[in-house]
A protein has these predicted regions:
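N-terminal accessory regions of nucleic-acid-interacting proteins
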Residues: 1-37, 42-44
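Metal-dependent phosphoesterase signature
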Residues: 90-118
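Flexible, glycine- and charge-enriched loops at secondary-structure boundaries
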Residues: 46, 101-104, 205
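Metal-dependent phosphoesterase core characteristic of DEDDh/y 3'-5' exonuclease domains
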Residues: 23-25, 30, 48-53, 59-91, ...
Length: 233
């Protein structure tokens, strides 16, 4: 972990939160765009490519501690259009939710339009330290670096460039636990992380929009506890 942090510092992809007083950040970062995709999945680890079936993003204003906007869309899978029973039971997403939903190509265009408007309204930028005022947040880096990246590659779709500026909150949470001698080998999920800090998961686990909202609650708690090291991927 320290080697990774040192390398992140060397290339300038490192965010250092030294203070978080009176709900005010001391550097430029203010807006956190938190996403959590849900994808097709199959029982018994059947090797089929994952396709996004829910695409949610919420915006956290870290100064006020509130969610100020959101984007959410179901997505129609095209490679394996029939949801497995396992997938529906896990996520609560039914075949009827995705049957008439737009494809990923259409959802990405809608998302880019929403993101452009959000950046204009908030006056925020993802350009990178030290000018960045916004960053994407995920619970594990799977959502962007594996799920979205692989599907965009297979379907020859452009990956939203702003998503390259992001942080993996699970890695940061593990680092924080390590600093409190709980250990960096902790392997719990989002619900477990919330329980560890005395919060309860609100909504349904494995529903993307609920996962994103709960990730924002965990992030806000970490900010309030002066968690220092935020490294981008």
């Amino acid at each position: 972990m320290q080697k990774t942090i040192n390398e992140a510092k060397r290339i300038g992809a490192f965010y250092d939160f030294n203070t978080f007083a009176q709900n005010s950040l001391t550097n430029n970062l203010r807006w956190f765009f938190i996403l959590d995709f849900e994808s097709t999945c199959f029982e018994d680890d059947i090797k089929k490519p994952a396709e996004i079936i829910e695409f949610p993003v919420v915006i956290l204003d870290s100064v006020t501690g509130t969610l100020i906007d959101s984007f959410q869309s179901f997505v129609k899978p095209t490679e394996n259009p029939e949801l497995s029973v396992f997938c529906s039971n896990l996520t609560g997403i039914q075949q009827c939710d995705v049957e008439n939903a737009p494809t990923l190509a259409v959802v990405l265009r809608k998302f880019e339009h929403w993101l452009r408007k959000a950046k204009e309204n908030l006056g925020c930028s993802f350009k990178g330290q030290p000018t960045s005022t916004a960053i994407f947040v995920t619970w594990t880096d799977w959502d962007i670096s594996t799920c979205l990246w692989d599907e965009c590659r297979r379907k020859k779709l452009p990956l939203p460039g702003d998503m390259l500026n992001r942080i993996d909150l699970k890695a940061i949470f593990q680092q924080w636990l390590g600093s409190h001698k709980i250990g960096q080998k902790w392997r719990g999920g989002l619900k477990d992380a919330l329980n560890l800090i005395g919060l309860h998961f609100e909504g349904r686990p494995h529903r993307g929009i609920d996962d994103a909202r709960n990730t924002s609650r965990l992030l806000l708690h970490l900010l309030s506890k002066n968690v220092l090291n935020f490294a981008t991927s």
